[in-house]
Amino acid sequence: MNRLPSSASALACSAHALNLIEKRTLDHEEMKALNREVIEYFKEHVNPGFLEYRKSVTAGGDYGAVEWQAGSLNTLVDTQGQEFIDCLGGFGIFNVGHRNPVVVSAVQNQLAKQPLHSQELLDPLRAMLAKTLAALTPGKLKYSFFCNSGTESVEAALKLAKAYQSPRGKFTFIATSGAFHGKSLGALSATAKSTFRKPFMPLLPGFRHVPFGNIEAMRTALNECKKTGDDVAAVILEPIQGEGGVILPPPGYLTAVRKLCDEFGALMILDEVQTGMGRTGKMFACEHENVQPDILCLAKALGGGVMPIGATIATEEVFSVLFDNPFLHTTTFGGNPLACAAALATINVLLEQNLLAQAEQKGDMLLDGFRQLAREYPDLVQEARGKGMLMAIEFVDNEIGYNFASEMFRQRVLVAGTLNNAKTIRIEPPLTLTIEQCELVIKAARKALAAMRVSVEEA
């Protein structure tokens, strides 16, 4: 039966939500009521599939905790007052922690003046952020296009590469197996997960995939494309595959890809949406090999966990294809003052507080602990790997991975799997995680694995 619109119902719902936003605490009955509401509304109006996913990785087999507020830079509190150490980091957005006071203050100050731009007058923060990124990024990267997400930043990179290379007769893109670049039509064409791709076939033509980390496969693909007249416009890849399971390429791989791109006249697009902003111990993961891309994609942590923002940064030579008509690729909300304020504050915090060095130090500490656990539990853990504060624990099968996430939830530590590799659990905490919290995470992982071994033995 068709449902008639109801202004009265919408007004009541919005008023109820506004009242909730104003609250700082909930009593027991309010907490129970909110939990029921959230579960019902997810089921009826968001997507019931999310409930089933949470049920599979949450202690007790229920639908999981309902988020309430940040407990500290590195913790979250649910509606029942339970505090969790965040080792998921919102899939990599909380590099400077939850509600970092510097970032929040910058956004609040800008909000008091002008939250969104007029579109007609020049907005100063967009200019200042573009200048800051030009100074921060490697090589000749100079001009920035701002958007709202990583997927959008990849879309902009693909369009920019097309606009630059089309007059040169180059239309093919090479991506890698296991890659994740987003789920919009263009980004999905570069992504390499059949589950995400098949329902939307056919995708954009001209995309080929080669094994990640295999430089000879990359050379062969570039050669074959040249022989058949399908010359390559760009190679797009992640320095470390995040959703693929935190897969690190062999040393020197990025350098070798850069040389191949130069040899064949292809642009190099690096997707640092997840690896950028200090996550791996460098501001950008490509800096571990001193590689300079033609186009760089950023998002996630760029907004400091406070505002969504993405950026596509390119060299002047490439970006100049948009000079004559800057309206060829635009977005209403991209580069808005609130998002730019958050990004500028985030960069300031990362540099001022030396969080890159902390990411390296604490990442080494955590990874050493996880590798020790892998040696102690070879029947459960296949490998622990990572760089900086981007780590993964790969289990012997998918079910054990789910069980580990559930057991960690019992220990009040949030973790989750990677989108392209279900048996791999990512460890991606804020770079602000304390040494004491690192020790607690390793202790929780040991307890979780011990409980899982008992369950396996009793089965």
From Swiss-Prot:
SUPFAM superfamilies, per database record: PLP-dependent transferases
EC number: 2.6.1.82, 2.6.1.29
Binding locations of pyridoxal 5'-phosphate: G150, T151, Q274, T332
HAMAP family attached to this UniProt entry: Putres_aminotrans_3 (MF_01276)
Reaction catalysis annotation: an alkane-alpha,omega-diamine + 2-oxoglutarate = an omega-aminoaldehyde + L-glutamate; putrescine + 2-oxoglutarate = 1-pyrroline + L-glutamate + H2O; cadaverine + 2-oxoglutarate = 5-aminopentanal + L-glutamate
CDD domains xrefs: OAT_like
Transmembrane spans: none
GO biological process terms, semicolon-separated: L-lysine catabolic process; putrescine catabolic process
Superkingdom as given in the UniProt entry: Bacteria
Gene Ontology MF terms in the entry: diamine transaminase activity; identical protein binding; putrescine--2-oxoglutarate transaminase activity; pyridoxal phosphate binding
Annotated disulfide bonds: none
This protein's UniProt keywords: Aminotransferase, Pyridoxal phosphate, Transferase
Cofactor: pyridoxal 5'-phosphate
Gene name for this UniProt entry: patA
Residues where N6-(pyridoxal phosphate)lysine is found: K300
Protein name (Swiss-Prot/TrEMBL): Putrescine aminotransferase
Taxon lineage: Bacteria, Pseudomonadati, Pseudomonadota, Gammaproteobacteria, Enterobacterales
Record-stated family: Belongs to the class-III pyridoxal-phosphate-dependent aminotransferase family. Putrescine aminotransferase subfamily.
Recorded metabolic or biological pathway in which this protein acts: Amine and polyamine degradation; putrescine degradation; 4-aminobutanal from putrescine (transaminase route): step 1/1
Function per UniProt: Catalyzes the aminotransferase reaction from putrescine to 2-oxoglutarate, leading to glutamate and 4-aminobutanal, which spontaneously cyclizes to form 1-pyrroline. This is the first step in one of two pathways for putrescine degradation, where putrescine is converted into 4-aminobutanoate (gamma-aminobutyrate or GABA) via 4-aminobutanal. Also functions as a cadaverine transaminase in a a L-lysine degradation pathway to succinate that proceeds via cadaverine, glutarate and L-2-hydroxyglutarate.
NCBIfam families for the chain: PRK11522.1 (NF008570), putres_am_tran (TIGR03372)
